[in-house]
Design a protein with these regions (language model features):
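Short active-site-adjacent structural elements
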Residues: 340, 367, 382-383
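Short active-site neighborhood of thiol/selenol oxidoreductases, capturing the structured segment around
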Residues: 18-22
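C-terminal scaffold of the Radical SAM
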Residues: 2-17, 35-62, 66-349
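Minor-groove-contacting beta-hairpin "wing" of winged helix-turn-helix DNA-binding domains
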Residues: 371-376
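A short, conserved structural fragment
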Residues: 361-370
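Short amphipathic alpha-helical interaction segments
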Residues: 347-361
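Short, amphipathic alpha-helical interaction segments positioned at domain boundaries
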Residues: 378-392
Length: 392
């Protein structure tokens, strides 16, 4: 058993994760299409903590006894939660399933000075990994992205997080309007210099229904075209690899052993319970993989939980074919690729050797020994098309 704050051995077992969704934000970022909500009155954290406890108990009834491999508090902005609320939620997870000492417990946080003041409380509650939504390291782009912090606050939060938590990750968004390769290289080098052991690096995308979608459609700003974005992606791989943070997934980079155990559960097609407004879960129930989808509106979700013990309003039981397709889509995002025998167990058949031969000839996929298959760097860029071809 590992000690508090240490990383678990990163074997390839898919795992069983618990995801908690805190849906509230201080402000809605213009690029964000996540289930997040702004409230101008204080949130009743006591009510939501009790609702999390109740829904976790209901999920335990559905999953049966399990050993948890990771816990992730996402959002929204979980760093708006009081440390006491976080402690209640983590205690509730431990009451319902086996939680070994030292498993990864991540909390997403914004780097504003107000939220950083809560870091020691989160650590005392049991959080051992923080993921900071830095997004940019210059004030002009932070304002463009609608962030409430500035660069000085971000650097202060990074330093404080390094001091308090055993593990730290932070996010950056690139392929921003007017961003040159030289500017991105300098910013990325600066980020790596702050000694995070994990970086999540996302290209700016325009999501339907967001303010950025309307502004982009009105030609108020432009993002890099596909060729320029591909060049920035290639530059990202080059710089991170040179500094010992290779991509272990399309957008995620880590020093060996510092990969996100929770996110690996998703990509390795493990099981996870989703609790909270808008949360999704995928776990095996009565021998079949079941999808759960919770009510998105926070207050409506809480009403449902208080009435019947959960806020799940949608879901399905996946067919074997759907499981196989999801396994491909998630697993080929990883540098380690997929276990071909596991795909066959899901689908009842192997991948088409003819299609594999064509994709290998095009340099889009490559075998790892006789047992695994991975997407190449070129294949990662067009992964949706590669998966669609393999799944036919």
């Amino acid at each position: 058993m590992t000690g508090p704050g240490m990383t678990m051995p990163l074997d390839r077992s898919p795992g069983f994760g618990v995801y908690i969704h805190w849906p509230f934000c201080a402000a809605k970022c213009p690029y964000c299409d996540f289930n997040s909500h702004v409230r101008h009155q204080p949130v009743d954290q006591e009510r939501f903590a009790a609702a999390f406890e109740a829904e976790l108990a209901t999920m335990r009834e559905r999953t049966g006894p399990r050993e948890v491999t990771s816990i992730f508090l996402g959002g929204g902005t979980p760093s708006l939660m009081k440390p006491e609320t976080v402690a209640r939620v983590l205690d509730a997870v431990a009451k319902n399933w086996t939680v070994p000492d030292g498993i990864e417990v991540t909390l997403e946080a914004n780097p504003s000075s107000v939220e950083a003041e809560r870091f020691r409380g989160y650590r005392a509650a049991g959080v051992n990994r923080v993921s900071l939504g830095v997004q940019a390291l210059n004030d002009k782009d932070l304002r463009f992205l609608g962030r409430l912090h500035n660069v000085d606050e971000a650097l202060h939060a990074i330093g404080l997080a390094r001091e308090i938590f055993p593990r730290l990750s932070f996010d950056l968004i690139y392929a921003r309007p007017g961003q040159t390769p030289e500017a991105w290289a300098a910013e990325l080098e600066q980020a790596i210099g702050h000694a995070a052991d994990h970086l999540s690096l996302y290209q700016l995308t325009i999501e339907e229904g967001t303010p950025f979608h309307a502004l982009h459609a009105a030609k108020k700003f432009a993002i890099p075209d596909n060729d320029h974005a591909a060049d920035l992606y290639a530059l990202t791989q080059e710089i991170t690899s040179a500094h010992g943070l290779p991509a272990y997934e399309i957008s995620n980079h880590a020093r060996p052993g510092a990969e996100s155990r929770h996110n690996l559960t998703y990509w390795r097609y493990g099981e996870y319970v989703g609790v909270g407004p808008g949360a999704h879960g995928r776990f095996v129930e009565n021998g079949r993989r079941t999808v759960t989808i919770a009510e998105r509106m926070p207050e409506t979700w809480a009403n449902l939980v208080e009435a019947k013990g959960h806020g799940v309003t949608g879901g399905e039981i996946l067919t074997r074919s759907e499981e196989a397709d999801e396994f491909l889509l998630m697993g080929l995002r990883l540098a380690e690729g997929i276990d071909l025998s596991r795909y066959e167990a899901f689908s009842g058949r192997g991948l088409s050797s003819a299609r594999l031969s064509v994709l290998q000839g095009e340099g889009l996929v490559a075998p790892i020994g006789n047992a695994r298959l991975r997407a190449t760097p070129a294949g990662m860029i067009v992964l949706d098309a590669v998966v669609a071809d393999l799944a036919r």
